């Protein structure tokens, strides 16, 4: 009876050992153990393997949760996040300080230019940063320590006056171009008014000279001619008049001729 019992034990132990080896568990075979049924031993091995199989990953998970590396990583992340916050606050402070400085300098320049020309400053409405020539270099590069680069600060706002002069020239040209047609129309209207007024004056003067001055001048010329004839006459007539005073076409001469005719007739009748 001893030999078959040993064979049965060896078969059961070998099968259980192979089954357990599939799950990575080894077991030594002891020949002195009591005989156990195959079904009961398989159930025991399954229970053992289940407990061992599920016990190991739980331990591994608990170890992973308690490892110091994850805590160190979380602390590092917190520190980097805080450092980023501090750097951002520094950058914002420096940028705002630089903006305040730029606006203060712009105000001083504007105060000087307002005393020179107030009208130009009223018309100009520039943007705060683009007018001063602060391009992307104005937002200077910030180092890891939070300091500003002096090169970008020096060369950022060096040409505000030139830009201001150019803008004022452009404004003046636009105004002149808008006023050109108005000025031309006003000049044309003035010339027409002057021509009309002078034309009326010229017409009045011409008519007055033709109707009033010319006859007066003619009468004066005839009087002068009569005086000259009297002075140049050689003798007097019968009635004490100069021969040069006779005017055949005059009314006095005609009356004289008629009277003389009547006298001659009366003299003949009386004879």
UniProtKB/Swiss-Prot annotation:
PANTHER family according to UniProt: OS07G0553800 PROTEIN (PTHR34379), PROTEIN, PUTATIVE-RELATED (PTHR34379:SF3)
Source species of the chain: Arabidopsis thaliana
Entry keyword Membrane: yes
Full protein name: Uncharacterized protein At5g23160
InterPro entries: At5g23160-like (IPR040411)
Effect upon mutating residue 271 to T: In strain: cv. Cvi-0
Topology of the protein relative to the lipid bilayer: Single-pass membrane protein
Any one GO cellular component localisation term in the record: membrane
Subcellular location(s) of the protein: Membrane
Coiled coil regions, renumbered to chain: none
Effect of residue 41 to V: In strain: cv. Can-0
Principal location class: membrane
Keywords: Membrane, Transmembrane, Transmembrane helix
Spans traversing the lipid bilayer: 179-199
């Amino acid at each position: 009876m001893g030999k078959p019992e040993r064979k049965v034990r060896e078969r059961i132990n070998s099968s259980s050992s192979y089954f357990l080896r599939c799950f990575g568990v080894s077991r030594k075979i002891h020949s002195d153990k009591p005989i156990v049924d195959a079904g009961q031993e398989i159930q025991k091995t399954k229970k053992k393997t289940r407990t061992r199989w599920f016990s190991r990953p739980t331990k591994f998970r608990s170890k992973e949760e308690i490892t110091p590396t994850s805590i160190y990583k979380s602390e590092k992340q917190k520190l980097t996040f805080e450092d980023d916050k501090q750097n951002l606050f520094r950058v914002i402070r420096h940028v705002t300080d630089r903006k305040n400085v730029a606006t203060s300098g712009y105000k001083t320049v504007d105060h000087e230019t307002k005393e020179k020309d107030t009208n130009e400053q009223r018309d100009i409405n520039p943007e705060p940063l683009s007018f001063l020539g602060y391009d992307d270099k104005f937002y200077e590069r910030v180092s890891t320590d939070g300091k500003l680069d002096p090169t970008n600060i020096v060369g950022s706002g060096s040409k505000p006056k030139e830009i201001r002069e150019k803008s004022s020239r452009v404004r003046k040209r636009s105004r002149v171009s808008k006023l050109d047609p108005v000025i031309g129309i006003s000049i044309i209207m003035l010339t027409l008014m002057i021509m009309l007024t002078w034309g009326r004056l010229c017409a009045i003067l011409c008519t007055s000279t033709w109707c009033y001055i010319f006859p007066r001048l003619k009468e004066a010329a005839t009087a002068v001619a009569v005086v000259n004839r009297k002075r140049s006459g050689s003798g007097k007539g019968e009635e004490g008049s100069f021969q040069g005073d006779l005017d055949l076409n005059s009314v006095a001469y005609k009356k004289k001729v008629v009277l003389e005719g009547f006298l001659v007739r009366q003299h003949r009748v009386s004879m």
